[in-house]
Amino acid sequence: MHTHNNFKTPSDEDELDDLDEDMVVGVIAEIEQEVLNESDSDNDEYDLVDMGAPVPDNDGDVSYDGNDSISSDDSFDPNAADSDSDDSMLDEAGGGSAGGATSAKKRKDDDNPSGSNKQPEATFDLDEDDETDETVRAMIAAIKKPRSSPPEIKLEDFITDICFHPDRDIIALATIIGDVHLYEYDNEANKLLRTIEVHSKACRDVEFTEDGRFLLTCSKDKCVMVTDMETEKLKKLYETAHDDAINTLHVLNENLFASGDDAGTVKLWDLRTKNAIFELKELEDQITQLTTNEQSKLLLATSADGYLTTFNISARKMYVQSEPYEEELNCMGVYRGDSKLVVGTSKGRLYTYNWGQFGYHCDMYPGIKSPISLMIPITDRIACVAGEDGNIRACHIAPYRNLGVVGQHNMPIESLDVNASGELIASSSHNNDVRFWNVKYFEDFGEIKYNEKHNAYKEQRHNLPSSKCSNTSDFFADLTKEDADGDDDPCAGPSNMS
C-alpha cells in the first residue's frame, strides 16, 4: 500500500516556513499551466463526443487521474485510503458494473417508443428438459385443450335472471335497471347482439315463448312486456298487469303464460287477448316459482309463506293446497316421467310429492344444509340446485344422491337455466357474471339403486368434470398410477442380475 508522505499537514508549521518562496511560486505556475492544458483537452474531447466520435481512451495519459477537477489541500484527509488500494479498485469495478447495467436497462427501455405503454412480448419457450416435467406437460395440455363451454359474460349491472333461447344459441340477461341484453354464445367468444330497454324498474324474470318468437319480461313496475324477437319491437304491453310487483313468469305454450306477484296473486294470460284469463289469490306472500307438467292441466305455485298451491287451469280454481311448512318454498321441478314433484326450501331440504298428491310430501331429503333458491331439471332423474353458498350441485332424484359440484361462483347464485339440448347450464351470481357449464356427461350417467352403498360426505364435496376445481383423490390417484407404471418398468428398481 502506498502512503502520501510527500504531503504535509497544516500543523507542520516549521517545515512549511523552510520552503523557498521562489520554489512555491514556480510550483504554482506549473500547476496552473497543467490545469489550462487539461481544460482545453477536455473541451476538445467533449466536442468530439457530441459530434458522434467515440470516447477517447485515457489509459495511456499519465496526467489523467479519472477526476473532473483537482482537489485542493484543504479537502485532503490524511486518514483516507489510498486511491491505488485494492478496496478502491473494487469500488471502481463495482461502479463500472452498475453503470453498465443501467445503460443496458436504458437501451432495453428505448426499444419502446417514447410515452408508449407497450411491453416487449414475452415468449414461452420449452426445451426438451422442460417438456419432461409433469407440471409443464399439464400446462401445455390445458392450453391446447379446446373449450367445452362459452367464456364468462361480465356486466356492469346486477343480473336478475337469465334464459336460453329454445332454438338459437342466444341467451337473454335481465338486469336490475330494467334492460335485457341478448348475447350470442359460442365456445370461443360471446357477442352482444342488442340491448332492449323494456322496464323502468328492475326486470325480475325473462322468458322465451316455446317457439322463440317472443320475449316475455316482468318487472317491479307491475308490467308485463312482450317483445318480438324478429323486429325487436314491442309486441304487447300489459300495463299494471298486477297491483303489486311481479316476481315470476311461466310459459305454458306458444300462447299461454302465467304470472305471480309479491302479494301471492297468480294470473293466467293469453297473448291473443288483452286481459287475464283468470286471477286467483290464495296466498299472502311472494310467489317464488310457477310450473306445470307436459299436459298443462295443473298450475303449481311455491310461495315464501311455506305453501305449495295447485290450480286447476280448466276449472279456473284452486285444486289443493299443501300443509304449511316452517320454511320458504323457493323452487321446484318435475321428474320421473311427470310422476314426481321435487321442491327446494330455504333450509336446504328437498321435498318429494307424488303427482296429484300435493297435500303433503311423500319423501324428504336433508339436502345440502344451505338455502336452495334455484332448481332446474337436467334429465328425468338428475336436478341441479343452487343458492347462497355459490355452488351448483347435481343430485339424483328417487333415490336421492348428491352427485357432486357442477360449478362454482364466488358469491350467491341469483339465476340458473339449461339450454334446449340439456348439455349447457348457465348461472349468474351477485358478482354480475354469467358462467357456462358443460354437463353433457350426465347423458352417460348410470342408474342408481336404493340399496347401493355410498359416502354422503364425499359425494357432497365431489367435483364433477365441469367444475373448475379438481378432487384431491384424483391427484393421489395419478401418483398411484405413476408408482404402478414404475413397478412395471423392467429398468426400474434394483437389478436382478447375478
Curated annotation (Swiss-Prot):
Protein name: WD repeat-containing protein 55 homolog
The organism's taxonomic lineage, starting at the top: Eukaryota, Metazoa, Ecdysozoa, Arthropoda, Hexapoda
Entry-linked SMART domains: WD40
A Pfam family the protein falls into: WDR55
Database matches in InterPro entries: WD40/YVTN_repeat-like_dom_sf, WD40_repeat_CS, WD40_repeat_dom_sf, WD40_rpt, WDR55_POC1
WD repeat ranges per the UniProt record: 154-193, 198-237, 241-279, 282-321, 324-363, 408-447
This protein's UniProt keywords: Repeat, WD repeat
Location of region: Disordered: 1-131
Biased composition, class Acidic residues, residue ranges: 12-23, 31-48
Family: Belongs to the WD repeat WDR55 family.
GO BP term, pick one: defense response to Gram-negative bacterium
